[in-house]
């Protein structure tokens, strides 16, 4: 690839990890989701920067699936803030008793965005990883490594609120 392609791939890997790391550290519910968006939009840039048909297909799939999942998560966060005034992750404890449907929808969205098999988030991340591997390049492997590390961080920052909603007392 060209230097511009290499730069785009490196920058996308950096922002995937930066967004995920910042999301883990963020305690404000909606800001955590915003950092997650930075990371996930970088997945799209990574896939498109591969400059292959499968990379572009993966980018479009993740664009669609991420949009559907993330709007669901933001709607849940907004509903929590409007109904309870709670904005911090630590304040979500016991919320499933007050807003069971909202918490259930958030949890389904979270496990999908984490990349749980058979859910949309898994499909698009699988397509991105497969497209990166198909390139047979070192940068493709760097992209796969960034995706795998980010998947672990995504589980941490999205399941933290869910665990608090269900398993921490009021």
Listing of model-derived features with the role each one plays in the protein:
Residues 1-165:
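Hydrophobic transmembrane alpha-helices and their helix-loop junctions in integral membrane proteins
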